[in-house]
């Protein structure tokens, strides 16, 4: 069986909820980040901005649920070689997963698959 660590390539992005996406984008642009992608998460009805500085990517998204949490890290995404294999390894290894299957969002050219 493949080792879990062998499937992880590095950090993919950090998810950051915000009540004011434009203010958040302006803040990070002031730090030298550039907008790599602006899109909408249709399923959640949220505006999304991916902000990049060198190898660091932040996914900022406007949500009505950020009250009292603005600026808090919501998720950290790891870049993996095979998301399906890692999902099975973690599920079968007894890890508590939030999703029953790998999910998809139509971000970027090929989309984003996650769990």
Question: Residue spans of the language-model regions?
Answer:
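Vicinal oxygen chelate
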Residues: 1-5, 10-20, 49-50, 67-115
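Short, flexible, glycine/charge-rich loop motifs used to bind or transfer phosphoryl groups or to couple energy/partner
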Residues: 4-5, 65-67
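Core segments of cupin and vicinal oxygen chelate
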Residues: 6-8, 16-57, 85, 92
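Short beta-turn/strand-loop junction motif enriched in small, turn-promoting residues
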Residues: 33, 63-65
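Active-site loop/turn elements of alpha/beta-hydrolase fold enzymes
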Residues: 40, 80, 102
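A short beta-turn/loop motif at secondary-structure boundaries
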Residues: 41-43, 66-68, 104-109
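Conserved beta-strand in the GNAT
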Residues: 59-61
